[in-house]
Amino acid sequence: AKACTPLLHDCSHDRHSCCRGDMFKYVCDCFYPEGEDKTEVCSCQQPKSHKIAEKIIDKAKTTL
């Protein structure tokens, strides 16, 4: 199996290579840094909605 790209690591070479987090797959998020011309920077990120969902699930686990 091909190695996946860890959280916050560069994924511009393969946008579908991000690893899985505890419950969700990270997404390759790209942006253009200010002052740079057409140099796209991509890294594996955890979407905010996933962070919130993980917090809710963790809380549910601790209250059970």
Curated annotation (Swiss-Prot):
Single annotated GO MF: calcium channel inhibitor activity
Note: Negative results: does not affect mouse P2RX2 or P2RX2/P2RX3 purinoceptors. The toxin (and its derivatives composed of N-terminal or C-terminal domains) are inactive against a number of bacterial strains.
Tissue: Expressed by the venom gland.
InterPro entries recorded: Spider_toxin_CSTX_knottin, Spider_toxin_CSTX_Knottin_CS
Name of the protein this chain belongs to: Purotoxin-2
Cystine pairings recorded for this chain: 4-19, 11-28, 18-44, 30-42
Family under the similarity heading: Belongs to the neurotoxin 19 (CSTX) family. 05 (U4-Lctx) subfamily.
Modified residues (Leucine amide): 64
Keyword Secreted: yes
GO cellular component: extracellular region
PROSITE patterns registered for this protein in UniProt: SPIDER_CSTX
Domain remark text: The toxin is composed of 2 domains: a highly rigid N-terminal inhibitor cystine knot (knottin) domain and a rather flexible C-terminal linear cationic cytotoxin domain that forms amphiphilic alpha-helices. The presence of a 'disulfide through disulfide knot' structurally defines this protein as a knottin.
Described function: Enhances the high-affinity desensitization of human P2RX3 purinoceptors. At 50 nM, the toxin decreases the IC(50) for ambient ATP from 2.67 nM to 0.77 nM in human P2RX3.
Region (Linear cationic cytotoxin domain): 45-64
Cellular localisation: Secreted
Keyword entries, A-Z: Amidation, Calcium channel impairing toxin, Disulfide bond, Ion channel impairing toxin, Knottin, Neurotoxin, Secreted, Toxin
PTM field: Amidation at Leu-64 is not mandatory for activity on P2RX3.
Source organism: Alopecosa marikovskyi
Signal sequence segment: none
A Pfam family the protein falls into: Toxin_35
Spans annotated as Knottin domain: 1-44
